[in-house]
Amino acid sequence: MVATVVNVQVKNEEKIETAPKKVVFDTKNLNLWYGEDHALKDINLSIHENEVTAIIGPSGCGKSTYLKTLNRMVELVPIVRTTGVIEYRERNIFDKSYPVEELRTHVGMVFQKPNPFPKSIYENVAYGPKIHGISDKKTLDEIVEKSLRGAAIWDELKDRLHDNAYGLSGGQQQRLCIARCLAIEPDVILMDEPTSALDPISTLKVEELIQELKKDFSIVIVTHNMQQAARISDKTAFFLSGEVVEYTDTNKLFTTPSDKRTEDYITGRFG
């Protein structure tokens, strides 16, 4: 079975034998309901460190719900109920002894629409460290610079740190939000369609940034853009009707999918 998608080019990477990467998130038999709506069904998925894992699928398939389950943001919806286990570094995130604030320190999130605070660029990045008790100005200065450099936007903003973040372009705002996420030194970065509101040039900058960030972080990205998933991810999960249909190396999923439904989706027969 060979599937092709117009203008989708998967990464051509030489296979090098390496030691297995550690599992960051291990999802076991996860089910989730919004009231009576069974949104996630028997999800089993392992996400590895220092990789970009893409989640694709049609609207309403459960991909954003799954992403928001990884840092328990989904619990902000009062009618949510879950069964099963998600282990982060071998610890069940649903365990009552695991403070959600601690989990979200390790697992940062970048949303679909850039959402800077109505503050200066500096204060946007320093906000998280301040909340965690850091008040020394020199330390905060260092964190702000390191985070903006990590988000590949320091050179653009270093002379504008006290300007309001609302004055930035959409692409700059999104990279500022990534810098704000980096400032709390997470282990994992969740991204919910982070480029869907951006122009092509800004999208390219964010994609290049993601490739750099995976050297130090594990990244899980939800995207409707199959070309983007093919360009930037190491593994891809295809969700459909709340189920994981297929989860494998990105190159394999886009060239030789093992499930007919995957082939139908990536070749545009539905979606």
From Swiss-Prot:
It catalyses: phosphate(out) + ATP + H2O = ADP + 2 phosphate(in) + H(+). It comes from the Bacteria. It holds the Pfam family ABC_tran. Its EC number is 7.3.2.1. Residues 25-266 form the ABC transporter domain. GO terms for cellular component: plasma membrane. SMART domains: AAA. Keywords: ATP-binding, Cell membrane, Membrane, Nucleotide-binding, Phosphate transport, Translocase, Transport. Disulfide bonds: none annotated. It is an enzyme of class 7 (translocase). It is a peripheral membrane protein. ATP binds at G57, P58, S59, G60, C61, G62, K63, S64. Its main location: membrane. One of its GO terms (biological process) is phosphate ion transmembrane transport. It is found in: Cell membrane. GO terms for molecular function: ATP binding; ATP hydrolysis activity; ATPase-coupled phosphate ion transmembrane transporter activity. Belongs to the ABC transporter superfamily. Phosphate importer (TC 3.A.1.7) family. Part of the ABC transporter complex PstSACB involved in phosphate import. Responsible for energy coupling to the transport system. The complex is composed of two ATP-binding proteins (PstB), two transmembrane proteins (PstC and PstA) and a solute-binding protein (PstS). This is Phosphate import ATP-binding protein PstB. The gene is pstB.
